[in-house]
UniProtKB/Swiss-Prot annotation:
Disruption-associated phenotype: The production of sorbicillinoids shifts mostly towards tetrahydrobisvertinolon.
Membrane topology: Multi-pass membrane protein
Membrane-spanning intervals of the chain: 52-72, 89-109, 121-141, 143-163, 183-203, 211-231, 280-300, 324-344, 366-386, 395-415, 427-447, 457-477
Protein name according to UniProt: Major facilitator-type transporter sorT
Length: 522
């Protein structure tokens, strides 16, 4: 007669009574707490409408933050009058906000606000309150130093939704279902900076630059309140940890979460050390991560370069007003939307067929990036060389659309490629890419004005076009030789081996379960 381990009944109100946990409830053999099948405490088992509503709020937060970063860029003339500053000093206000996107996560690691330890909900509450406070203060600034410092701190806290919202979506949807949600989420950081100047231009022209900041405060504040009210904690490890505490308090026995059992209890110092140093290890020691990050950073930097370039091209050279000048971004915005539609179509028609046939590998993500890699320089060169007074203004705006189209089709597949390649290390890899592109996005606007005034519109716009042209072969090369390269890189090889072992374990477990069913039926 085989010995059967005692199991703990679940009675927390989060899962149905009758579900059982393995273990004995002792120090040597604690009950192992994990999500059960159809467990309502697992965010992945929530209703589709609820999950999509939460995902929409999380994505809207990313859009609001990036919208705020660029809406400021069209207020130059009014800020000049109020503070008597140069163009270069004004642009620092844009750059510092974007630089905060890179610095923010490192700061939180030091002060202990990490979602791995405390969950995502507390980060949402603290960072949105802080953004509203700092942006509200910047709207009332009486000198330029206060304006710049407060925008930097607003950007520092604004970096939280850029990282945390993607994690929230991953908490809600299993990999096979999260493609559409992540596609829309990944477009928000590019659509926000493009639409910010359009709205900001008309607000600045009508009621002044302080109300541009005020509108952003209201926008972020409303989104923050929506999140506080409607987004509960979604991070699985934290939810399981809370459940272990509830169960232990209820009956006095020993419970540990399945992750703590498998990985050990994480000390805050260990989490902080990993958060601070691991992204840099991947960035500088993994060629795939470095090249992909450089490519994405050039695109991201070019998006923010346009914040300084568009006023020169259309306001200075063509004499447009601040409000009308913001409409020049519509061409790129339309391109981004078309890129989103293409990405969704490609995922549903091509990639999901490969996934269903179990023939998808990380390189299967890259064909759209090959198309986008061609569209990027076409859009940039077309924008650069159709901006003559003799050519109608609509031509350059329309021809900037391929750049927006290419942004989505390069960034999204490359991010998915990095996730599929590094799997267990994906969070650190994406953090490395995000930090690098945020730094580049902060630097590009600093030299935009001088570059356009010294080189002229055509050659200044051609420089990022040449950079994207140099990067164009990367998706094609990785599509052809990516598997061989991955096997030669330390961490991508480790990730592949780990996933292979996990799949073997799952197969073995499934086989054992089938045998047990057959035995019991006999």
């Amino acid at each position: 007669m085989s010995h059967t381990e005692p199991k703990a009944p679940v009675n927390t109100g989060e899962v149905e009574n009758g579900h059982l946990y393995d273990g004995s409830g002792t120090e040597d053999d604690p009950f192992i707490v994990e999500f059960q099948k159809d467990d309502p405490g697992n965010p992945m088992n929530w209703g589709q409408s609820r999950k999509w509503f939460i995902a929409a709020i999380a994505t809207l937060s990313v859009f609001a933050v990036t919208f705020t970063s660029s809406a400021y860029s069209v207020s130059a003339n009014e800020v000049f009058k109020d503070f008597d500053i140069s163009t270069e000093v004004f642009i620092v206000g844009l750059s510092l906000f974007v630089l905060g996107f890179a610095i923010g996560p490192a700061v939180w690691a030091n002060i202990g606000l990490r979602s791995e330890l405390y969950g995502r909900q507390i980060l949402w509450i603290i960072t949105h309150i802080a953004m509203v406070a700092f942006l509200g203060g910047s709207a009332g600034s009486q000198n330029v130093a206060t304006l710049l410092i407060l925008r930097f701190f607003a950007g520092t806290f604004g970096g939280s939704p850029l990282v945390n919202s993607g994690g929230t979506i991953a908490d809600l949807f299993p990999p096979a279902q999260r493609g559409l949600a992540l596609t829309i989420y990944c477009v928000a950081p590019f659509l926000g900076p493009i639409l910010g100047p359009i709205v900001g231009g008309f607000v600045s022209e009508s009621v002044g630059w302080r109300w541009v900041q005020g509108v952003c405060v209201i926008f972020i504040g409303v989104v923050g309140i929506l999140g506080i009210v409607f987004i509960p904690e979604t991070y699985g490890p934290v939810l399981l940890q809370r459940r272990t505490h509830q169960l232990a308090k209820a009956d006095g026995k020993i419970y540990v979460s399945v992750l703590e059992k498998n990985q050990g209890k994480k000390l805050p110092s260990e989490v902080f050390k990993r958060a601070l140093f691991r992204p840099w290890i991947f960035l500088f020691l993994e060629p795939i991560v470095l090249i992909a990050s450089v490519y994405m950073a050039i695109i991201y930097g070019t998006v923010y370069m346009f914040m300084g370039a568009m006023p020169i091209v259309y306001n200075e050279d063509r004499g447009w007003s601040v409000g009308i000048g913001g409409l020049a971004f519509l061409g790129i915005a339309v391109g981004i939307i078309f890129g989103l539609v293409y990405a969704i179509w490609d995922n549903n028609v091509r990639y999901m067929k490969l996934f269903a046939a179990k023939s998808a590998n990380p390189e299967s993500r890259l064909p759209p990036a090959i198309v986008g890699g061609v569209a990027l320089p076409i859009g940039m060169f077309a924008f650069a060389w159709t901006n003559y007074p003799s050519i109608h203004w609509s031509v350059s705006i329309i021809l900037s659309a391929p750049f927006g189209f290419g942004c989505v089709l390069v960034i999204l597949p490359i991010m998915n490629y990095l996730i599929d390649t590094y799997t267990i290390y994906a969070a650190s890899v994406l953090a490395a890419a995000a930090i690098f592109r945020s730094v580049v996005g902060a630097v590009f606007p600093l030299f935009t004005t001088q570059m356009y005034h010294n080189l002229g519109i055509h050659w200044a716009s051609s420089i990022p076009a040449f950079l994207t042209l140099l990067c164009m072969p990367f998706p094609l090369i990785m599509y052809r030789y990516g598997e061989a390269v991955r096997m030669k890189c330390k961490y991508s090889f480790e990730a592949a081996e780990m996933m292979r072992k996990m799949q073997l374990q799952q197969t073995a477990a499934a086989t054992t379960t089938e045998k047990d069913k057959d035995s019991s039926s006999e």
